[in-house]
Amino acid sequence: MSKPLCSTGLRWLWLVVVVLIIDLGSKYLILQNFALGDTVGLFPSLNLHYARNYGAAFSFLADSGGWQRWFFAGIAIGICVILLVMMYRSKATQKLNNIAYALIIGGALGNLFDRLWHGFVVDMIDFYVGDWHFATFNLADSAICIGAALIVLEGFLPKPTAKEQA
C-alpha cells in the first residue's frame, strides 16, 4: 500500500523547482549578456565571469575528449534517482534531510540540463583573494555543496527519540 506523497519527503520537491529556476535563470542571464571570458566585478573578492566547464568540479576530466559529458550526466541522473527514493522513504517532518536532498537534486538537474543542452556547464561565480582565484562555479554547485554540508551537519545532530518522532 502506498503512502500519501504529502507525508513523505517528496513534499519538499518545490525546493528543487526553486533551485532550478534560480540556477537556470542566472545561467540564461550570463549567456545572454556575456561573451565567453567576460568579467564584471560585483564586490571586492567577487566577480561574475563567464566560463564553460566541460568536466566536473574544478574542471576534473575537462580535457577527456567528450565521453565525460555522458559519464557525468549518468552520475547526475543516478544521484537524483537515489535521493528521490530517499525522500520518498523519509517523513516530510525530517526537514534537514529533505532540504539537503532537494538542494542536491536541484543543483544536479541544473548542471545536467547544461551538459545535455549546451555540452558544457555554465559557470559564472569567481571568488578571489588577491591574485588567487577559487575555481569558477555556479548556483547549482552552491546548492549541491550546501545540501552536502547539511547532510554532514545532520550526522552530528542528536537523533530524535521515538517519542519525539511520533
UniProtKB/Swiss-Prot annotation:
Membrane topology: Multi-pass membrane protein
GO MF annotations in UniProt: aspartic-type endopeptidase activity
Entry EC number(s): 3.4.23.36
Main location: membrane
Protein name: Lipoprotein signal peptidase
GO cellular component terms listed in the entry, alphabetical order: plasma membrane
Pathway membership, UniProt: Protein modification; lipoprotein biosynthesis (signal peptide cleavage)
Transmembrane among keywords: yes
Similarity annotation: Belongs to the peptidase A8 family.
Family matches, as PANTHER family: LIPOPROTEIN SIGNAL PEPTIDASE
Keywords per UniProt: Aspartyl protease, Cell inner membrane, Cell membrane, Hydrolase, Membrane, Protease, Transmembrane, Transmembrane helix
GO biological process terms, semicolon-separated: proteolysis
Annotated TM spans: 12-32, 70-90, 102-122, 137-157
Active site: 123, 141
InterPro entries referenced in this protein's UniProt entry, alphabetically: Peptidase_A8
Superkingdom of this protein's organism: Bacteria
Organism whose genome encodes this protein: Salmonella schwarzengrund (strain CVM19633)
